[in-house]
UniProtKB/Swiss-Prot annotation:
One of its GO terms (molecular function) is homoserine kinase activity. The keyword Kinase applies. This is Homoserine kinase. It comes from the Archaea. It is found in: Cytoplasm. Its EC number is 2.7.1.39. It holds the Pfam family GHMP_kinases_N. It catalyses: L-homoserine + ATP = O-phospho-L-homoserine + ADP + H(+). SUPFAM superfamilies: GHMP Kinase, C-terminal domain (SSF55060), Ribosomal protein S5 domain 2-like (SSF54211). Pathway: Amino-acid biosynthesis; L-threonine biosynthesis; L-threonine from L-aspartate: step 4/5. Keywords: Amino-acid biosynthesis, ATP-binding, Cytoplasm, Kinase, Nucleotide-binding, Threonine biosynthesis, Transferase. Its main location: cytoplasm. One of its GO terms (cellular component) is cytoplasm.
């Protein structure tokens, strides 16, 4: 095997009350990565969405950091070239950096037949997130590897729970800049016990809803975060307006990750109406898609 091409999905993290825990893999948008064996070293090329803003230096690129660590740990002596085609806009709130991290970890596991488990791939993938977010975290890379719905319940040791789900979502991507760093810095360092009780209760209810195929309950609780979303809503112009306009057309709506992407669980009969509202307010791309699989191989040479 000389080269492998993989698809790595966009993801939505938090989903309301599941801050830094819940994650959902999307069928679209997605990145494609090609990893090819070379004689020595690691080289990176990027095209697609905002490619000009993405560093190709190994230590400054999320995929490069993951690849370097894996190759050191497994004493891989050959080199590799990583080509990333960005289908997921960086800074969108749809796990763009995570797709690169997860995609390269998955590709290296295939290319060099390392035999790593999905949990081990999540662990390596999360290391690359430190480049984008300042610290390793797994709420996006976990669904990118596992697919479906994931819960990252512990980091020491790393524990990820996976629930296969069949849900359709409608995602808006406003053309608004939201810094992940800023979106984290504005969050409270302490919260009232009542807010904790609310969020734990709603998060638990979402899991119950998944196991009972209750979209209405899942969406209603997804919309009830009282800690993170209220802080971040002001970073996304028009969000409160949109939330009010679509409230009877969706089972649930919330900010995807740190934003600006907005994720909804739409009522099927209102999908077109919701899309029109998104476009009227934000004039932005909209994705109507299913919850998707994790990374998968598209081509092998």
């Amino acid at each position: 095997m000389k080269k492998v091409k993989v698809c790595s999905p966009g993801t939505s993290a938090n989903l309301g009350p599941g801050y830094d825990i819940f994650g959902l893999a999307l069928s679209k948008p997605y990145d494609t990565l090609e990893v090819e064996k070379t004689e020595q070293g690691i080289t990176i090329s990027v095209d697609g969405e905002k490619a000009e803003e993405i560093s190709t230096k190994v230590d400054e690129n999320t995929a490069g950091v993951v690849a370097k660590k894996m190759m050191e740990d497994f004493n891989i002596e050959s080199g590799i070239h990583i080509h990333i085609n960005k289908g997921i806009k960086p800074g969108s709130g749809l796990g763009s950096s995570s797709a690169s991290c997860a995609g390269v970890a998955f590709a290296l596991n295939e290319l060099f037949e390392l035999g790593l488990s999905k949990l081990e791939l999540v662990k390596y993938s999360s290391l690359g997130e430190a480049v984008a977010a300042g610290a390793p975290h797994a709420d996006n890379v976990a669904p990118a590897i596992f697919g479906g719905f994931t819960l990252t319940t512990s980091y020491d040791p790393l524990e990820v729970l996976h629930i296969p789900v069949d849900i359709e979502v409608l995602v808006a991507l406003p053309n608004i800049q939201v810094s992940t760093k800023t979106a984290r810095e504005i969050l409270p360092k302490e919260i009232p016990i009542n807010d904790m009780v609310n969020n734990v209760g709603k998060a638990a209810g979402m899991i119950y809803a998944l196991y009972n195929n209750d979209l209405e309950l899942f969406g209603r609780y997804m919309s009830k975060d009282c800690v993170v979303e209220p802080c971040r809503a002001n970073l996304i112009d028009g969000y409160d307006e949109v939330k009010e306009k679509v409230k009877d057309m969706v089972y649930g709506i919330t900010i995807s990750g740190s934003g600006p992407a907005i994720i909804t669980i739409p009522k099927k009969e209102h999908v077109i109406d919701i899309e029109n509202i998104f476009k009227d307010v934000w004039n932005c791309p909209v994705y109507y898609t299913k919850v998707g699989p994790g990374c998968y191989v598209e081509e092998i040479e």
